[in-house]
């Protein structure tokens, strides 16, 4: 339950693209807003205080409110797999990475250098504050890979090995928004390698 003194913000449900029959939808949306208000207030407090130049704040989350049909449209299904990752700090710029898919495995590779920690992190992804190389290595290419056998690049999302399942997901899809066979081949190999790694680690 939200605090009794919390001032709820009016909701324009005409903007909601999913189903609206669930009784918990509106309470979830208010909780979502409340959590963001608290985080925003905390960040503003730090940024206006004496520690602003020596403090790094990172936040991520997984908001279940997305499960209320908001991804019923094929072009919005990537929201099933999308969570926020926000970093506040002096003079931080993410450049071209802002439009590229990333995953939780990229977080520590991004945060450690900012904290002065050098060296590779186990099973790390890429540093999201550096530009993507012209030829990124397949293990750390700017794509998302999910245990369900789905993959996502900057243009769209698809089921591995199924070109017909490709759906454009970018807010402003480029004219070249189409299935990329090379991305699919690399991610099928990466999926198999990660599956093998997990099974070996668990001695299955």
Residue ranges, per PLM feature:
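Solvent-exposed soluble domains appended to multi-pass membrane proteins
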Residues: 1-204
């Amino acid at each position: 339950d939200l605090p009794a003194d919390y001032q709820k913000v009016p909701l324009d449900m005409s903007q909601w693209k999913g189903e609206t029959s669930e009784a918990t939808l509106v309470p979830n949306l208010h909780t979502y807003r409340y959590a963001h208000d608290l985080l925003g207030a905390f960040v503003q407090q730090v940024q206006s205080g004496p520690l602003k130049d020596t403090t790094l704040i990172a936040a991520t989350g997984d908001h279940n409110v997305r499960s209320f049909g908001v991804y019923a449209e094929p072009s919005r299904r990537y929201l099933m797999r999308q969570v926020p990752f926000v970093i506040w700090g002096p003079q931080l710029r993410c450049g071209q990475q802002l439009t590229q898919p990333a995953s939780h495995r990229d977080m520590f590779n991004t945060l450690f250098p900012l904290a002065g920690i050098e060296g590779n992190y186990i099973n790390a992804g890429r540093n999201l504050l550096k530009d993507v190389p012209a030829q990124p290595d397949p293990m750390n290419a700017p794509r998302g890979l999910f245990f369900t056998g789905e993959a996502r690049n900057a243009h769209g999302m698809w089921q591995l090995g199924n070109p017909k399942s490709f759906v454009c997901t970018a807010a402003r899809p480029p004219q070249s928004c189409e299935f990329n066979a090379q991305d699919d081949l690399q991610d099928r190999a990466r999926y198999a390698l990660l599956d093998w790694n997990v099974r070996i680690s668990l001695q299955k």
